[in-house]
């Protein structure tokens, strides 16, 4: 084990023990955004006059982000260290102690759906493929062999990208069914109906069981294996097509970030655009996001059509929903909670509803983000489509997404497009 590995492991342990809530930094004068909504930070920080808590960083140490990307020697070692970025006593049911952030921003952040690891759900059958163990991390293999002997009853250590995808899809459906300005405490029945679609039960249309089943049959992903952004997007597309009553179309580009309007309209509706979720799997660099894409990536969260960004390294996927300056705010799926009993006709208790939301802020500097990600947009109608195209074409810096009127033909092996230089790389799950 080299010195770099030891240093990274030590840093990860420190991050787990010292996990201060981010402060509304005085040197960042920009507003904070949450999925297209802007919140000014110049309001009084504490109407009651109480002082904000001091940072918990260790003296003499630089700020450590809650989920700094690691450079580990193997996926097994990384999985073994994949502890939640939030200590157990700081889960979603605890209100934020910070008085520095605009209350309206915190209310909006808390109203976003947050899916995490769950345990004690109906077993997901194991694959009978003899090569399956080779695709699993060491911790998952051990748990499968000694604990979940009859199938997976928890997704700890392998389901974080699925949970991030569920969060993205649920918040898109929330905008359609509850409204963008919906906040917790209202429309409880409708909120419970939406959550029932994602229950950890094979009968629920967007359950982890359905994701795993489709991933195994169409994406080559074994039960217990970590999903990548591309496989997650394909699962969302297939499961949404099966669940007709959600009235949501899905347009997926897993081989790049080019959007072709003729293809999009075939899916969204040739006679008028109906609500359509656009999912783009991209890779914006090698080890980190290339700086030329920073501004375009920040702008994506500010678009009113944005439903967030899901992605990260294996065993470390996050769901990004906010931005301020160079920092991205995210929901962390790496917490294991008991599965909620599934009953589509019943209302969840306040305690169970609390486990799908958090007011606890977490953020990551853009330079620490992994370049592989799944970007989501919700286009509700023709006006939304026109506004989205206008915003994309006026972006500052290198654009991430390009829109074309027609699908372009495949280019020959020895032909090269002029604009192919410095282009966003298509995302392949196996590249991680």
UniProtKB/Swiss-Prot annotation:
Major site of localization recorded for this protein: cytoplasm
Source superkingdom: Eukaryota
Active site: 160, 332, 334
Region ranges (Disordered): 74-97
Localization (cell): Cytoplasm; Nucleus; Preautophagosomal structure
A Pfam family recorded for this sequence: Peptidase_C54
GO cellular component, one term: phagophore assembly site
Molecular-function GO terms, alphabetical: cysteine-type endopeptidase activity; protein-phosphatidylethanolamide deconjugating activity
Protein name: Probable cysteine protease ATG4
Species in which this protein is naturally found: Coccidioides immitis (strain RS) (Valley fever fungus)
